[in-house]
């Protein structure tokens, strides 16, 4: 029996960037399944809890809730018996990248 393919959740409020990220991920990591793509931090938390993906790709600057705030909310709500997914922050803003590293992101 082969292990299940890893599943990912993408949280990106810019549709073109979300599509580009999906395309790049498919090319670089063919076995990765994109479980869902959402456009804001609140939906990211809800979908991550519902789908429990293996990898999260969060834009940092999103409407409603930033990716950083969504990651904190998700960590607080994540089931204790489940391993927390790998978290990758996606940003073009240096100041947010520093904050993400301080939060021990990938």
Give the residues covered by each predicted segment:
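Alpha-helical interaction/dimerization surfaces of two-component signaling modules
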Residues: 24-28, 47
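Charged phosphotransfer/docking patches of two-component systems
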Residues: 15-22, 97
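Conserved Asp/Asn-Gly motif in the active-site loop of CheY-like receiver
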Residues: 35-42
């Amino acid at each position: 029996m082969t292990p299940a393919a890893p599943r990912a959740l993408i949280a990106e409020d810019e549709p073109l960037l979300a599509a580009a990220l999906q395309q790049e991920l498919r090319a670089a990591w063919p076995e990765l399944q994109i479980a869902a793509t959402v456009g804001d931090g609140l939906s990211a938390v809800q979908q991550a809890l519902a789908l429990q993906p293996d990898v999260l790709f969060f834009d940092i600057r999103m409407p409603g809730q930033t990716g950083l705030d969504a990651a904190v909310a998700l960590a607080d709500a994540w089931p204790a018996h489940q391993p927390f997914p790998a978290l990758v922050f996606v940003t073009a803003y240096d100041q947010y990248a520093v904050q993400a590293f301080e939060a021990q992101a990938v």
